[in-house]
Amino acid sequence: MDKLLAWSVKQQQEGTNEPPPDPKLLAQLFGAPDDAQLMVQAMVVITQPDNKLEDKEVAFDNFEMLVENLDNANMMKNLKLWEPLLAQLSSPHPSLQKLAAWVVATATQNNPKSQEALVEQGDAGIKKLVDLTSHDDPEVVVKSLFALASAIRNCDDAYKLFESADGLKKVVGHLKPDATAQVKSKTLGVLTGILESETDLMKPEEKRQVFDILVKELETDDHIPSLERSLHVLVLLNQKGFPFTPEETEQVKKAAKRVEGKLDEEDVKYNEDLKYVNNL
């Protein structure tokens, strides 16, 4: 209160242009709830059985926006919010399952503390997300893939849980001709996250499986972003110690030519993956 009074006095003095007081301090001063309280309140709305589905969805949207802040995401552990959040992955309502997966993705993205907090939840987290990649609702599948990509990147403990849930086999299964562009994109995002991790996580036989599938995809897929991402994964495989035979090198170069033919001249000029393949 003293700081607020001092600021008010200075503002009234001629020629003074003091910066306004911290909005968070003002909020606390006048009794507005802080982010921790808002997160808890949102989760109460989400978990109350009698609340309308629409109200729960709005609360989830608010919760997701709050955990975009790294500090807020890391508060989830102390606030004991991980357990009720992950319970929503088993909700009978696909919209709540989707939103829960989205929050996991947001909270763990480039956030080692939240990744470890998720790992501590065991099968309720990673394994359940792997299971949801087989959901009938494509939006649940997309958000679950997004969550897995965020959760396992550069987190060996999360990858171990992913591996024990047979995650790679289930995720790679989405790389098929009839999969939507969005599902393919998120699937390739998971593979990219694994291969760009500092630790070489994939086993040789798993790399072989991914290579064989992607080479076929590059022959038939016409979605430019998917083509570019598929080629990037092939490059990452090679960089992570998966050697191409002369025949496979020709396959990759053929795929790269197909990608090149879909891009404009400027994109080709700055595409590092095309440069890499040309130098094989």
Swiss-Prot record:
What gene name is given for the protein in this entry? FES1
Q: Which family does it belong to?
A: Belongs to the FES1 family.
Indicate the principal place this protein occupies in or around the cell. cytoplasm
ARM repeat ranges per the UniProt record: 10-51, 70-109, 112-153, 156-196, 199-239
Per its record, what are the GO molecular function terms?
A: adenyl-nucleotide exchange factor activity; phosphatidylinositol binding; ubiquitin binding
**One BP term from GO:** cytoplasm protein quality control by the ubiquitin-proteasome system
Q: Where in the cell is it found?
A: Cytoplasm
Going by the entry's taxonomy, the superkingdom of the source organism is recorded as Eukaryota
Q: Which organism is it from?
A: Yarrowia lipolytica (strain CLIB 122 / E 150)
Q: What is this protein called?
A: Hsp70 nucleotide exchange factor FES1
Reported function: Functions as a nucleotide exchange factor (NEF) for Hsp70 chaperones which accelerates the release of ADP. Required for fully efficient Hsp70-mediated folding of proteins.
Recite the UniProt keywords alphabetically.
Cytoplasm, Repeat, Translation regulation
